[in-house]
Amino acid sequence: MIKTLSPSIFTLTIALFAIIASNVVPLTSNNAFAQQEGAENSKSVLHTAIFAGGCFWCIEADFEKLDGVKEVVSGYTGGNADTANYKTVTYEQTGHLEAVQVSYDPSVVSYAKLVDYFWRHIDPTDDQGQFCDKGHSYLSALFYSNDEEQKIAEKSLSKLQEDKPFDAAIVTPLLPAKEFYLAEEYHQDYYKKNPIRYGFYRRGCGRDNRVAELWGNEK
């Protein structure tokens, strides 16, 4: 004898299949979503670059104007001591320079662009410091973190030496990156926290006038 399902059991079975089917997502959809999510995450990975351009208040402010730069922090690098703070660096006890660490989106701005931008916001002819600030801690330097950055920096420097709009020699060195020590909170975004004092200092130091004298409209 052939057994048949009762109407109630049949209805329950159909309902159960419907619930299961409604919660099934095709594998292709999951894969596509995962690939899209991975692509978005890869675009958001930031790179970092380190530059010393005299007073870190100023070079921090300059780099934060550049599209693709997500964050700039002030700090100290290039020295021999295993620690650094404003007092010891200013009194030249550690060999460090005032510097900035730039976090940037390479899909928006390239390392080569950062290097070119750096050159045009410093005085690369000054071997005593930068602008009104003199002393070892205010010397300029470009720090590379890997072979690719080194090649880009060397290529940029070579081109600059051929095309520079001034006669003086370029003395800013290209150096392998060392440990970067974050500066005190007081110095971070100083130009935003103390705009009047910062503006007075920057104008008084002659930074913008000297940059304009060297580079004209090449910024």
Question: In which residue ranges do the predicted regions lie?
Answer:
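Flexible coil/turn and secondary-structure edge motifs
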Residues: 2-6, 11, 16-219
